[in-house]
Amino acid sequence: GFKKGKVFLFQVRPVVLKKNYSTYKKEDFITALNKLKNKIIKLKKKNHNLIGKTTYFGVMPDWNPAEIIGIKPKALAISLYQELITDFIWAKNRESYGFNDMTSNHLMSIFLGTPFIDVRVDFNSWLPKNLNQSTKEKLINYYLNIFKNNNDYHDKIEFKILFTSFNAETNDRLKQINNNLISLNEKKKISKELKEITLN
C-alpha cells in the first residue's frame, strides 16, 4: 500500500521456483512407481466394506476432481477437497437420501499427485439401502462391467451407467438389462426404491 508517498509491504513471499526434476535419480522414479503399483493392487482387492470384486479409477467420475481442482492440484487444494467433500461429506449426503451408508470410505485416492475417484466406492454409494444384498451385488457387477467396457462413460456415469433417481427412462433402462443378470422382481424392487428416494 501507499501512504504519503511511502510504500508499505504487508507480506513478503519467497519467489517460487519450478521443481527441478533433473535432480531426481532414475531409482527415485522406479521406487515411486513401485509404491503406486502396490497401492493400486491393494485398493483393487476385494474389500469387506464394499460390494464388488475389484475397482477402477477415473479423474472424471462423480465429483470430477479433474475439472474442479485439476489433474495436478497443489497439496492445499487436495487437502481442502478431501476435507470438504471426498472424505466424508459426500457419503453423508447420499446416505441421508436413502442410499448405502458409505461414510467409512473415502471417495478419492491420490496417485503421484493426481486425484482419482474410486469407482467401486462411488457405485456402492448409489445403491438404495433397502435393496437386499444379492440385488446390490448384481447391480454393482453390472455397473463395473459397463464402466470397464466403455471408456467414454467416465464423465457420464450418472446418466449412462448408474440408477441414481427415478425418472421417465428408469423402467426402460431396467428392461434393457438381461433378466439372467437381474430378475424382473429385482428390477421392480429397484424401481420402487428409486421412486421412494426421488419422491422424498
Which role does the model predict for each range below?
Residues 1-200:
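Conserved divalent-metal-coordinating catalytic cores
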